[in-house]
């Protein structure tokens, strides 16, 4: 991201982590469970299973009267399995063919002989600000590295070699640093003469790292975060006009 500032970058980061709507299991109704794990622990595991879904086809439950739901705000998963064997996410049967666990091989619980797990779990939209099961991603950012060279380095090879990220390249009086640079400044400390090389972070350019921990792709999370931030700015502008 370029031509911006830390305040804007941090607002975007916070939205990615806490305000992107995610479909996650909220309630679990157990009909039978005599496994080694008690109901609450299995329910907790199910709540953290990432689900693939189309966010355009779902809305929040609060659009309905309390206690009422529809196929666009709730998806029901059923598990009915007998031991012995391991219950995986592939054993979760969905009421909506377009909604399923992101991975089929996530273990839920191991069943031994004469043990059975039968349940229904309902998934609905939520955001990370309200519950950890609905967090879309882990997002962070850092400044884009910029380099300044004053004078000629006496130990070019040593400076290039000491970089742990292999991110610096020097060709005569030209120095290039790629995005892998984490501003550790090992090259700066090694530079001879002292002070001839300087690497700083550009506070108007940012490198984002977005790791999805949900059924959404990182690019989907970024685009949704931008849309949400735009809406917040627009709503804020309306409130300011009311003051006038």
Region roles according to the model:
Residues 1-244:
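Protein-protein interaction/assembly regions in multi-subunit complexes
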């Amino acid at each position: 991201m370029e031509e911006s500032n830390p305040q804007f970058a941090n607002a975007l980061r916070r939205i990615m982590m806490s305000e992107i709507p995610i479909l996650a299991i909220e309630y679990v109704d157990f009909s039978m469970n005599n496994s080694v794990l008690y109901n609450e622990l299995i329910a907790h595991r199910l709540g953290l299973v990432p689900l693939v879904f189309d966010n355009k086809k779902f809305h929040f439950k609060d659009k309905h009267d309390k206690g009422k739901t529809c196929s666009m705000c709730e998806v029901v998963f059923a598990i009915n399995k007998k031991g012995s064997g391991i219950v995986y996410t592939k054993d979760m049967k969905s009421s909506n063919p377009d909604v399923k666990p992101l991975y089929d091989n996530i273990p839920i619980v191991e069943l031994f002989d004469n043990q059975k797990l039968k349940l229904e779990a309902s998934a609905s939209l939520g955001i990370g600000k309200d519950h950890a099961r609905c967090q879309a991603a882990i997002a962070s950012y850092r400044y884009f590295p910029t380099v300044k060279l004053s004078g000629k380095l006496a130990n070019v090879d040593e400076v290039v070699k000491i970089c742990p990220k292999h991110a610096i390249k020097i060709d005569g009086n030209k120095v290039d640093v790629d995005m892998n640079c984490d501003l550790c400044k090992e090259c700066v400390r090694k530079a001879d003469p002292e002070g001839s090389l300087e690497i700083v972070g550009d506070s108007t350019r940012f490198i984002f790292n977005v790791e999805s921990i949900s059924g959404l792709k990182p690019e989907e999370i970024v685009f949704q975060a931008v849309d949400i931030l735009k809406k917040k700015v627009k709503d804020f502008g309306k409130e300011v006009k009311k003051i006038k």
